[in-house]
Amino acid sequence: MASEAERTFQRFAVFGESSSSGTEMNNKNFSKLCKDCGIMDGKTVTSTDVDIVFSKVKAKNARTITFQQFQEAMKELGQKRFKGKSPDEALENIYKLMEGKDPATTGVTKATTVGGVSRLTDTSKYTGTHKERFDESGKGKGIAGREDVTDNSGYVSGYKGAGTYDKKGSN
C-alpha cells in the first residue's frame, strides 16, 4: 500500500516543478495532493490544517518534505479526518483515498473566443494589408509582411530588368 502512496507522492511532487526529482514535495503540491485526493474535505480537515501539519513535519528552515515526513503528515491528517479510528486504520484509509490519483488540471484557464475575440485572432479572416502579414497557416511573416522591400540590384534606380542584358545581346 505504501508503494502506491509513494508513487502518488512522486507524481504530485513533480507536478508544476520542472527541476523536481520527485523525492521532495513543496507546500503547494502537498496542499494540491490533499485537495485532489479528498483528504482535505473542508469540514474536518481544512486548508489551514494541511498547512499547519506541513509546517509541523518539515525541517526547521526547509521548504520541502521527504516521503518519510509525508507519511508522518498523513498519520496526523488521518487521525483528524477519520476520528475514532486507530492511527493505523486512519492511515490505511488515507492511502486508499490516494490510490491511483494524478494531479488534476481541472479549472485551469483555457483560451476563450467569446464574442468578437475570434474575429480578431483568426488570421484567415484578416483583410487588406493586414492579410499580407501572415502566410496560409496563420504564422506571421515578420518584416517581409510589414514592409515593401525594394530590389536595388539594377544599373540605375529605375532599371527593372537586372540580369537580362546578356540574354538580349546573344540573339
Curated annotation (Swiss-Prot):
This is Tubulin polymerization-promoting protein family member 2. The lineage of its organism: Eukaryota, Metazoa, Chordata, Craniata, Vertebrata. Belongs to the TPPP family. It holds the Pfam family p25-alpha. The keyword Transit peptide does not apply. GO terms for biological process: cell differentiation; microtubule bundle formation; microtubule polymerization; positive regulation of protein polymerization; regulation of flagellated sperm motility; spermatogenesis. One of its GO terms (molecular function) is tubulin binding. Residues 129-149 have a biased composition (Basic and acidic residues). It comes from Bos taurus (Bovine). It is found in: Cytoplasm, Cytosol; Cell projection, Cilium, Flagellum. Probable regulator of microtubule dynamics required for sperm motility. In contrast to other members of the family, has no microtubule bundling activity. Gene3D superfamilies: EF-hand (1.10.238.10). Keywords: Cell projection, Cilium, Cytoplasm, Differentiation, Flagellum, Spermatogenesis. GO terms for cellular component: cytosol; sperm flagellum. Residues 120-171 are annotated as: Disordered. It comes from the Eukaryota. InterPro entries: EF-hand-dom_pair, TPP/p25.
